[in-house]
């Protein structure tokens, strides 16, 4: 109890002392707090920096191990690809070697067999020799036949020439040109002429008509008719000696038929005739002349509307009024247009000019 009384008596002083002590300690408390905060901030900064350095070391180690793992994995893939490429190249080289050996064996055995080709060439050479001998014999036979035919042809030609020149044979009174007295012996042609017979020409057989009609007589006496070689009577005279042309050929050349020019042969109104012919063919093909004829009762109540050209007060222009031939006074010169083209001189002379030998120029 005494202690309680003592403490109660001292309670007022304790409160004052507590307040005084706290007021004295407040400045030191703030300084100590600032110092503690500074120390804690420095310590925590050191702790954080140390932890960051630790994390950097750990991250570096992790990255090193991870990158080494990726590098080893990539290297393994590269090694596998290189190994696969090397093996494929080796397999290809081996396949090429096998194919080369097999193809060489196949070509040597089946395609280019040396011994078979040697036998084949031997047989071919023997066959060629036999064919060459047969061809040589055939060529010699053909050459002999050709020489024989040429000799026969020359003999016939000489015989015909001798028969043709039989008039040059010498007589008892007059020697011929091949039997000159200045020669020691006569020419071989003299003996050929003596063996040959004179050439005789066969006269063409002309059938003479017993009676001639009036039309034939008019055709013969017309202005444009010419005598023909086939209807001429035979001329009873001696055959002329010499290399002359045949009489029928000369007469055909002399009395050849009329050859009109292009201007005379082609009609002037050919275009008009062609148009009329075309119009006639179209008219023959038509089933109905009035192709677009309307119904019979359709146009009864329809009002007629004249055209502006016909209903004008000036009137229509006449059809031939604008033609050049209707107004000769308006011509610049007195001559009209030439409607027909002139003929070509070169074409008109075709087949009409002959040389002295009778050939066409």
UniProtKB/Swiss-Prot annotation:
Magnesium in keyword set: no
GO molecular function, a single term: calmodulin binding
InterPro entries membership: ASPM, IQ_motif_EF-hand-BS, P-loop_NTPase
A Pfam family the protein falls into: IQ
Keyword terms, alphabetized: Calmodulin-binding, Cytoplasm, Repeat
GO CC entries: cytoplasm
Keyword field contains Membrane: no
Residues in IQ domain copies: 32-61, 55-84, 91-120
Intracellular or extracellular location(s): Cytoplasm
Protein name (database record): Spermatogenesis-associated protein 17
Gene: SPATA17
């Amino acid at each position: 109890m005494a202690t309680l009384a003592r403490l109660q008596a001292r309670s007022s002083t304790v409160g004052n002392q507590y307040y005084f002590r706290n007021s004295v300690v407040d400045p030191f408390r703030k300084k100590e707090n600032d110092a503690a905060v500074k120390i804690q901030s420095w310590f925590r900064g050191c702790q954080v920096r140390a932890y960051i350095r630790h994390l950097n070391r750990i991250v570096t180690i992790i990255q090193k191990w991870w990158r080494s793992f990726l590098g080893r994995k990539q290297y393994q893939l590269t090694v596998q690809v290189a190994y696969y490429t090397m093996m494929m190249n080796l397999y290809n080289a081996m396949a090429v070697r096998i194919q080369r050996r097999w193809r060489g064996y196949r070509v040597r055995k089946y395609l280019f067999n040396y011994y078979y080709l040697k036998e084949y060439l031997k047989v071919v050479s023997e066959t060629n020799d036999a064919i060459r001998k047969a061809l040589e014999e055939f060529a010699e036979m053909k050459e002999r036949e050709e020489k024989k035919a040429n000799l026969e042809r020359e003999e016939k030609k000489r015989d015909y020439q001798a028969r043709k020149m039989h008039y040059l044979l010498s007589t008892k009174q007059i020697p011929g040109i091949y039997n000159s007295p200045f020669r020691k012996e006569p020419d071989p042609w003299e003996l050929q002429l003596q063996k040959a017979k004179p050439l005789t020409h066969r006269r063409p057989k002309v059938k003479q008509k017993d009676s001639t009609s009036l039309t034939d007589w008019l055709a013969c006496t017309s202005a444009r008719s010419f005598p023909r070689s086939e209807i001429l009577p035979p001329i009873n005279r001696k055959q002329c000696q010499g290399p002359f042309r045949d009489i029928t050929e000369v007469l055909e050349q002399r009395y050849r038929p009329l050859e009109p020019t292009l201007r005379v042969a082609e009609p002037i109104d050919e275009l008009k005739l062609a148009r009329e012919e075309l119009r006639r063919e179209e008219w023959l093909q038509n089933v109905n002349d009035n192709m677009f004829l309307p119904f019979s009762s359709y146009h009864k109540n329809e009002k007629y509307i004249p055209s502006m050209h016909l209903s004008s007060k000036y009137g229509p222009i006449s059809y031939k009024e604008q033609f050049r031939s209707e107004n000769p006074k308006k011509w610049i010169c007195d001559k009209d247009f030439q409607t027909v083209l002139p003929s070509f001189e070169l074409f008109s002379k075709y087949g009409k000019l002959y040389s002295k030998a009778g050939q066409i120029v």
